[in-house]
Regions:
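Predominantly the C-terminal beta-signal and adjacent terminal strand-loop region
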Residues: 29, 130-173
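Transmembrane beta-strands of outer-membrane beta-barrel pores
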Residues: 35-41, 56, 73-81, 107-111, ...
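Flexible, solvent-exposed loop segments that connect beta-strands
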Residues: 77-94, 124-126
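Residues that define the transmembrane beta-barrel architecture of outer-membrane proteins
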Residues: 44-54, 93-99, 130-134, 141-143, ...
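Short glycine/proline- and aromatic-enriched beta-strand/turn motifs that initiate or cap beta-hairpins
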Residues: 26-85, 164-172
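Cleavable N-terminal export/targeting peptides
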Residues: 1-30
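Short, positively charged, low-complexity/disordered linker segments
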Residues: 115-139
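Transmembrane beta-strands of outer-membrane beta-barrel proteins
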Residues: 29-33, 65-73, 99, 110-116, ...
Length: 173
């Protein structure tokens, strides 16, 4: 029962984040297309792609540091892994679609950023085995390009929890 109430709160928080990010004026948003490779345990690789909208940055001060945060919303796809003799009994051979919303923090070091999102996973696999997932991203963004290291997991609230770790490169416009 306790699990169900936590799950309901996480769903409400995710929905609120997606609504806020979706309400961004189009002229205030930066759009990004990202692609790369995702790895799970055992060196099993898959393709990954994301489409992101990042809102206008909001500056704030934390001690002596001048930082900014920006809302973000993303749609993502993690491709299937090929069927092999080693993974024939694992649930890894179909794609997973994600919708996520959260925030990006920047200004702490040059053009680096840290993002944290809550995600809804439409499909399940042994890597993303619950409808809700946590997404953490560490990256660098230029005027037109970005590179990011991202991890997606449900924090072991549901097993199996292999998670996905990926390196993404993208363009901004």
């Amino acid at each position: 029962m306790r699990f169900q109430s936590w799950r309901s709160r996480a769903s409400l928080l995710l929905a609120a984040g997606l609504l806020v990010a979706g309400a961004l004026p189009a002229q205030a948003a930066t759009f990004e297309i990202l692609g790369g490779r995702s790895k799970t345990s055992g060196w099993r690789w898959a393709d990954a792609a994301f489409l992101a909208a990042v809102g206008k940055a909001h500056p704030f001060t934390l001690g002596d540091h001048h930082l900014s945060w920006a809302p973000d919303a993303e749609l993502g796809w993690i491709g299937p892994r090929p069927v092999t003799a080693q993974n024939v009994h694992e649930n890894l051979t179909h794609p997973v679609w994600l919708a996520m919303g959260g925030a990006r923090l920047s200004g702490f070091w040059r053009r680096a950023f840290f993002g944290f999102d809550l995600a809804y996973a439409k499909d399940r696999s042994d890597t993303l085995s619950s409808p809700y997932e946590f997404v953490s991203t560490l990256g660098w963004q230029g005027e037109r390009y970005l590179i990011a290291l991202r991890h997606i997991s449900n924090a072991s609230f549901h097993e199996p929890n292999l998670g996905e770790t990926m390196l993404l490169v993208g363009v901004r416009f």
